[in-house]
């Protein structure tokens, strides 16, 4: 595989930069006149702070979308770290080593499959571009010694908090479901919605031990009803996509609603760790639920298509 930098950086709009670790995860640097927010710090495999320093000299506050290791791996490089109040404790706890081992195993399989994918794309489809290609690990990184250092948050965030960066304000929206501490950040002036793992153009992991399917349905419905008209672009964190149209919010909310009401078809899926999950497939995404989870026929009907 060709040698390329671990991180891909791209200016998405005025004062907003993508810092991607393709195809693993996206982080976003958001600049105001006097301060900056780094929304997630990625895997902790490369030095994301060095990348940030090349883009800005403003004081940086890390805001974790949630506590998972693929979003907080670079926290150790920063002093100012904020997370929703319900994520403070798990952020400070050790990441189970088996999670990291399983992720490395998945990464190896993914790299092998990508070679086939790239060959097919070059022959037939022509959809990939160089920014999507997986990178080799940095020379200083030893996969066998990969560890995500627990970090202590310097600030606990709450629903409705506003982060004033100077001529840019980011509103904290608590969106539990994937994890209890999931948040989104909304810049009402530009219409940018940074969604972490609340919205994903791929599998939504609602089957994990601290996931809550009903909470995910409520959170996505809330985004689609209370905030939809304020959104011009959605910035997600996974699956080789870093910008989505606002209608995607509605699609996901309607998908969760259809699933809960028993109006969606289900099959068997497997997550990146090889664990079984119930899988619901939709046009631009899927939803994983615990194998024993069942729809609730008494759930209230209604879709955002009507509400809009």
For each feature predicted by the language model, list its residue ranges.
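Metallo-beta-lactamase
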Residues: 35-36, 43-44, 145-148, 154-155, ...
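Structural signal for conserved beta-strand scaffold positions within catalytic alpha/beta enzyme cores
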Residues: 11, 18, 64, 82-83, ...
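Conserved beta-strand hairpin/beta-sheet module of binuclear metal-dependent hydrolase folds
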Residues: 5-54, 185-200
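Accessory terminal helices/loops
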Residues: 1, 135-137, 202, 218-308
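Short, solvent-exposed secondary-structure boundary motifs
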Residues: 1, 17-21, 143-147
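Active-site HxH/HxHxD metal-binding segment of metal-dependent hydrolases
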Residues: 45-164, 201, 247, 251-266
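Residues that act as N-cap/strand-start positions at coil-to-secondary-structure junctions
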Residues: 3-4, 13, 22-24, 149-151, ...
